[in-house]
Amino acid sequence: MRRLCLLLATVLAALTGVVALPATSALAASAPPSSTGQRWALKVNGVYVSAEVNDSGDQNGKLRARSTTVGSWETFSLHTDNISGVGYGTTVSLRNEENGLYVTSEVDTSGAQSGMLRARGTNSGSWERFYVVPQGGGQFALKSAANGLYVTAEFNYTGGDQGLLRARSSSVGSWERFTFVPVDGAGDTGMPPQSSVTASGRHDIASWNVCANNNPSAACKLQYVDGDTVGANVASGVNGYLNHRPEAIFFQEICEKAVKPLELELESRLGGGWDVRFAPTYYKVVATDGTSDTGLLAQKTCADSTSHKDRGSFGIALAVKDTNTWYRGYTLPSPDKKEQRPALCATVPETGTVYCNAHFSSGSYFVDGNQAGDDPDGISRRKQSDALKGIVDKLQERGYTPFLGGDLNTTHASVDVLSSLYASHQECGQPTPGSPHDGAPTDGNNKIDYLFGPTGATYACEVVDPSLSDHRMIHATITL
């Protein structure tokens, strides 16, 4: 990231405590849309829906079906938040790419604009939630959770309200049938250029599940805190507990709006230019008929901060030098109606390296005597391991030396589910390729965080505890 480093307003008093920084509106405003999240355009009767972000007053951000092309005004990402007793994925919220705000059903508006849709919500609640109702042929109706009515495009309106979207119909006709048209948001669509550099020398990579959403564990000091505070504390933990400045850092369980503050804080504390990218965790959108094969994915939202600020989506982040020219997010094969887990890769052409961060599905664990893991039998984690290897293999074919890992949610007892990774890479807990799959614990008494690199290199692996998360940070020094 080529910009001036952030001037810290507050010095952290202790690395083990969370220091609440003053609200920084510039950082909140500059928090990017999900770097690699899927994006969609909505099409009805042959035209695309636009958010009129240049309109003023109570018309600002109103949605109209009126465009023949797709730009940022016509681009939306889908999000899903937790509904008590129901969970994620049963409703979606739409966030506009241009202004970063959620689409709201204005159910308190009266007259001809009653129930009109506007991109103006800073949080997702009942006014921002919509049920997805399949109509066949790849079309869907949207039913507002605020008033139980279908969204209609008012093609008979004239002037500035022509094509206005309103939640006002009790039945579905052609004006209520929408098509979600994918607008690629995964990152670069092609592969990176062939590397002209052969990686050599020493490489330092770290990985840390920072537990910064709403985990109730007392060890998760960053639950429900805002992005500025997460960025400051996480960067301080990296800086204070590692003996060497890492060249790449993998983060898991982080909220989207902590990404920009984290980037600035890494630059301030570690020096140099950093580029921090984000990839969301998804849920398959569950239609009103109970099916989850709609083809739509919605990003899991982080719980709001204690100050009721929206913290964006939940997922993983990858910090590398700001000279990287290629990045891409992936959705790994995951259990149906569970979290659809992400991977995120970025190249650094000047060193001939590529870095891939992943967060695999949770294994077997119990809450109140009930199985709470997404993948207790390891079937999905094995598929995720195979998929990550396939991603890395293609990048390696382009001449890049890969470093990969993250929170793979796999203990030594079930490490065979990672066999495809061990077959072609060496893990930092292994002094030699043939050494046991071993290493210091990273979560309680278990090792579930891993860092891999080329086989045959010289490896050193340490685990440190900045006391901010229920996970410890794992740090690999790999000499080629």
Task: Label each region the model flagged.
Residues 29-58, 72-111, 126-158, 174-190:
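Extracellular glycan-recognition/adhesion modules and their associated mucin-like linkers
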Residues 1-30:
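Secretory targeting and sorting signals
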Residues 191-193, 390-403, 409-480:
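Metal-dependent phosphoester-hydrolase catalytic domains
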Residues 96, 144, 319-322, 344-351, ...:
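Active-site beta-strand termini and strand-to-loop segments that position acidic
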Residues 23, 183-268, 278-293, 300:
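N-terminal, active-site-proximal structural segment of metallo-dependent hydrolase catalytic domains
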Residues 191-193, 197, 254-352, 360, ...:
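Structured beta-strand-rich core segments of catalytic domains in phosphoester-bond hydrolases
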